[in-house]
Structure formats: C-alpha cells, structure tokens
C-alpha cells in the first residue's frame, strides 16, 4: 500500500522539484488489470487525446486507433499496467510522432542508460557553472529552465560574474527544457534592451474545443547585457524542448552560432493527465511558434550552424575563437565565477517538517504555500495522510543535496520507514514545490 501511495504522490505533487531517489526504489508492485480496468484506461487516454491534444484531428485519429484495438481484443492479454501502457504508447506514437506525448506505468522501472550511467553534476535552478576563459570568453552551462521566480536570481548572479566578457559560450547540450518565460529571459541577455523584442509564442488548445489561445514572450531588461557580442551555443541530440527553443530563438534572431548536433525535436508543451489503474500520461496541449520563422523545430530538431559531435562542441568553438581547443570546461577555465549552492536554504528543513506535520494531522498550513502548491496538496492530502500514518513518528530530517531545479532534498526517517523529500521555497519563503519518493535504504 505504501509504495502505491508513493507512486501517486511522486506523480501528483512533483512540481518544479526533481526527486533524487534512485529509479529502482520508485517501482511499486503492479496491480493486474481486468477487462473493465483496461477499458477504463483506454477510455481515459482516448478522452485526453480528443479533448487536449494540440492537433485535434491527430488526437481524434489516435483515440480511434486505440479504441479499435481495444474492441478487436488486441489488449486482452495486457493485464500488467506497464505492458498495456507500453502498447498504448506505441499505438499512439505511430499516429502522433510527438516526443512530448508519453504513456507509461507507475510501476515500470526506468530503462538503463545505453552507454552506462549518466554523468552526475550539480545545478542550481538549471545553472551548472559559469567561467571566465582565456581571450575574454565567458562560458555558462544551463541544463534546465525552471519557472522565472527561481531561474532569474540564479541566472542574474551567474551572468553578473561574466560581465566584461567579449564573447559568450552558452552550453545547452544537457538541457531538457522548462519554462518558455525563462527561455526568453536568457535570450534577453543577448539583445539590446532599448525596446522589447518578440521572442516566441506558445499556442495552446482550449481543452474540449478546437479553439486556441496565444501567449507571447518578449525580452526583458537584464542586470548585465551581452548585446552585440559574439555568441556560441553548444547543442547535442539530448538538447530538448525549452533547450531547443533557446537554440532556435538565437538562430532565428541571428544572435549566435550553433555548434554541435541536431537537437531532439520536441516543440509541443505538455502536461500530465491522471489516467488511473497504474497508468500515467503526458499529453501535449500546445505548440511553439517563432515570430520570425512562423514555425518551430517539432520532429526535426534545430540544425547547428557548425555540425560536430556534441563531445567536441566546446573544443571546436574555442578553436574558432583562436583559443587552445579543449573539450573539458574545467581545463579551459581560468576562473569559475559561479557554482551551484551546496547548503540548504534557511527555512527549508522547517518546511519539510511542516509538510509532514500538516499531512499527518490532515490540517496543512496552506498559508505557508503558494496557491498552486496548496491546490496540489489538497488533491493528494488523503493519500499523504494514509502514507504518513503507516510511517509513524518522525525521527530525523537530514539534508542530502540541492537538486537540479534548486530544491533542497532531505532524507527523512520515521519509526517505520524512510523517505526522500524535496522542497522548493519561493522568493517569499512560501513552499512552491515538493516531491516525495522512497528512500533507497533498508525498509524503504
């Protein structure tokens, strides 16, 4: 029961915080699906496709395909939620060809990386490091675009450290995306601040209709500016979503040279849909539209101006700038001017204890949360209360690390088990995000 609740909570309340628990520890036991449950899953996925998918005709076609497959008995042997989800994903992907559209199972283990474990690194609000290199070159690596309230202060600090650089290298080779508003803010450092520049639009489908709404993103004033200075953007085939948007925007505005690989090819913003029966889905509800090109990079990726293997992108950029060509930023750096925070924010441990106490009693302090996080907490309160009742008395809260999005991660021990809890505090000190996952230790 506890593992099942944890799965629901990790899906439901994970806001901008990324859980740090190993994937293997997050796999609850599967509950087999009977015919009625399979029918319910297909019905809910179909409804989400018809009502929310950004391209209504494609959503209708995909929904019809899985409905026909169900009626033909093609899913009759798929009692395991992971097996059903995998087949549904394959059937829908064959129609939509959308990398942001995903159907999966809570109990499915994460696949092992094809080339061994991914290299570990620390980031704060998506910023890994900023360095001054020889030749007046500034370097910054950005691996994600969290909401602007969290991204801006960290980016401002990192970019201030690069002030005076004659050339800028921005590394998004490991960037998986995020907020389009934060993408626009990073672009803002590269363009003149005399008047706002239209950077990107997100065209969103109004759920249940064929109507669309448009949100435009423009440049904003920045504390330092690199307008008019040469810019190099490093890309890889792992650069995705918002990371791709940044590269695409820079290219469309003719504000930099892209060096590296064609990016992943995902331009449609997505959101979670509650399916139930151990199945989860993310359904793209919008599309990016660049005001210069009137299109985006969906399905194609962003073409670099200088195509080289991602591992060589920094080396090639440095060589083009007349510097010693090295692939490792640590070797190229003369001075690291920004490093991620490695200690918890004041108040984050108290926030974790407050969340535990509120969920245990069934009376959270919603006034200590942002409105969005308070709404999510209300939705999942009964499950959280059941979980904490099973865990028993709180014994200890021990800081572990700062996660990639700037959340503080803690090991939380109880009388009957342990959790990994992350909490994200907003600029006003309110709890703005959080996640719960099993501990990797004994008894988890």
Regions found by a protein language model. Give the residues of each.
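Surface-exposed, charged secondary-structure patches
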Residues: 383-433
């Amino acid at each position: 029961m506890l593992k099942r609740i944890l799965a629901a909570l990790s899906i439901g309340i994970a806001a901008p915080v990324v859980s740090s628990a190993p994937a293997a520890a997050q796999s609850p036991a599967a509950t087999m699906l009977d015919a009625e449950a399979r029918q319910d899953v297909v019905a809910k996925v179909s409804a989400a496709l018809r009502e929310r998918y950004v391209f209504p005709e494609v959503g209708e076609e995909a929904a019809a395909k899985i409905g026909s497959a169900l009626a033909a008995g093609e899913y009759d042997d798929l009692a395991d939620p992971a097996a059903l989800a995998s087949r549904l994903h394959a059937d829908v992907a064959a129609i939509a060809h959308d990398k942001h559209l995903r159907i999966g199972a809570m109990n499915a283990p994460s696949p092992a990386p094809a080339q061994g474990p991914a290299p570990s690194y620390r980031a704060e609000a998506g910023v890994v490091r900023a360095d001054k290199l020889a030749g007046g070159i500034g370097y910054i690596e950005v691996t994600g675009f969290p909401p602007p309230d969290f991204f801006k202060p960290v980016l401002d600090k990192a970019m201030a450290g690069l002030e005076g650089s004659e050339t800028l290298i921005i590394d998004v080779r490991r960037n998986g995306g995020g907020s389009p508003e934060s993408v626009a803010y990073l672009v803002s450092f590269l363009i003149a601040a005399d008047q706002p520049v239209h950077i990107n639009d997100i065209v969103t489908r109004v759920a249940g209709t064929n109507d669309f709404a448009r949100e435009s993103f423009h440049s904003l004033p920045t504390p330092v500016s690199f307008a008019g200075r040469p810019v190099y953007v490093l890309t890889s085939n792992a650069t995705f979503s918002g990371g791709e948007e940044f590269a695409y925007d820079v290219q469309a505005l003719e504000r930099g040279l892209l060096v590296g690989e064609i990016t992943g090819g995902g331009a449609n913003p997505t959101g979670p849909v509650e399916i139930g029966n151990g199945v989860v889905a993310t359904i793209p509800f919008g599309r990016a539209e660049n005001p210069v090109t009137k299109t985006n990079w969906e399905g194609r990726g962003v073409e670099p101006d200088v195509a080289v293997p991602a591992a060589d992108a920094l080396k090639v950029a440095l060589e083009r700038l007349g510097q010693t060509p090295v692939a490792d930023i640590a070797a190229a750096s003369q001075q690291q001017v920004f490093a991620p925070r490695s200690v918890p924010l004041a108040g984050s441990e108290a926030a974790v204890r407050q969340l535990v106490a509120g969920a245990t009693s069934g009376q959270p302090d919603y006034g200590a949360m942002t409105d969005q996080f308070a709404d999510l907490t209300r939705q999942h309160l009964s499950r959280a209360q059941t979980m904490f009742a099973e865990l028993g008395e709180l014994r200890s809260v021990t800081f572990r690390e700062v996660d990639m999005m700037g959340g503080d991660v803690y090991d939380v021990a109880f009388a009957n088990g342990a959790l990994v809890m992350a909490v994200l505090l907003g600029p006003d000190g309110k709890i703005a995000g959080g996640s719960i996952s099993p501990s990797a230790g004994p008894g988890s």
